A protein has these predicted regions:
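Amide-donor transfer/coupling interface in amidating biosynthetic enzymes
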Residues: 44-152
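Cysteine-nucleophile active-site neighborhood
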Residues: 1-63
Length: 152
């Protein structure tokens, strides 16, 4: 997964997907390696860290959704992302918790990961954004295959 994401594969991850893409998950005194696509670690808690409706404003560039769009859904997570302040984010949280400090939606290359469980009917721009990102990636991959290997 990390190799494909590093090559530019578009990845949209919600909650558990965000956790999977992190470097590691910590539960009590144990740490477990994860995919390593995101330069963050996740710590699990015994109580919810975010619970309820979440609404975000897309206020920074990202691979999937136009700036100015509003996305709505819910969050329910017992985890907190460590070092989230050191990554680029695309969402200003208007309602809810997200990653904390009023932000959600980490962006690394073409990976966007957030705690937001999106309600697709309340976020109509997302489907076309996901399909558009996938089509761009396919065109780039096809062009790279036609060009052949780089000379050494």
């Amino acid at each position: 997964v990390a190799l494909a994401a590093g090559r530019g594969l578009p990845v949209w991850a919600e909650c558990g997907g965000l956790m999977f893409l992190s470097r590691s998950i910590q539960w009590k005194d144990s740490r477990y390696p994860m995919a390593g696509c995101l330069p963050v670690d996740v710590a699990l808690a015994e109580r919810p860290a975010g619970h309820g409706y979440e609404e975000v404003l897309v206020d920074r560039p990202n691979p999937f959704v136009k700036m100015g769009s509003r996305l709505r859904g819910h969050e329910f997570h017992y985890s907190q992302v460590r070092d989230a302040g050191q990554t680029e984010t695309a969402f200003e949280v208007k309602r809810g918790t997200g990653l904390g400090n009023g932000r959600d939606g980490m962006v690394i290359n073409r990976v966007l990961a957030s705690y937001l469980h999106l309600h697709s009917l309340a976020s109509p721009d997302l489907a076309s954004g996901l399909v558009g990102a996938a089509l761009r990636y396919r065109r780039e991959e096809n062009a790279a295959r036609r060009a052949g290997p780089l000379p050494e």
